[in-house]
Swiss-Prot record:
Family: Belongs to the Smg family.
The name this protein goes by in its record: Protein Smg homolog
NCBIfam families: PRK03430.1
Species whose genome carries this gene: Xylella fastidiosa (strain 9a5c)
InterPro entries in UniProt: Smg
Superkingdom of source: Bacteria
Length: 157
């Protein structure tokens, strides 16, 4: 069974992190649970490395920049990220849901995935996982979660 890092991350996020946030699990028990549901140890390890890099690269700036430079995507980013996902990132930054450092962290984590291409749905999951890991980003996370799962999202002010 060929699985991707994103599939492992989505499974972790859906079954361990979001609904059971109070549940403390060590890496070994998480890995055993993932193996039991059919993920390969290699993909599980890559997913844990992805999460470690996410935790290690938390942005320090908590206030969004106003009227900053426009992000220009380049070579590998253009190849991997479709037009909708790139536009979505710019939209999130313009709306103040992501600041520039968070946007760059989302891009870093998206580029670290083992998929050749990421579509809009994949990008939304990456954004959600990054915001989940960001202290002080609760409102942005809630907005993004509503955008993905709920009714019409409320404007974020």
């Amino acid at each position: 069974m060929k699985e991707s890092i994103l599939a492992v991350l989505l499974y972790l996020f859906e079954y361990y992190f979001s609904e059971n946030a109070d549940l403390v699990r060590d890496r070994d028990s998480l890995q055993n649970g993932l193996i039991q549901v059919g993920f390969s140890p290699a993909e599980i390890n890559k997913a844990f490395e992805w999460l470690d890099a996410l935790a290690a690269n938390r942005p320090t700036l908590t206030h969004p920049r106003v009227n900053g430079p426009v992000r220009v995507f380049h070579g590998p980013e253009l190849d991997k990220l479709d037009v909708e996902s790139r536009g979505f990132l710019l939209f999130l930054e313009q709306q103040g849901i992501l600041n520039t450092e968070q946007r760059e962290l989302v891009l870093d984590r998206a580029m670290a995935l083992d998929q050749e291409e990421l579509d809009l749905d994949d990008m939304k999951w990456v954004v959600l996982m990054v915001l989940f890991n960001q202290p002080g980003a609760e409102a942005a996370y809630a907005w993004m979660e509503t955008q993905m799962f709920g009714n019409e999202p409320e404007p974020l002010h």
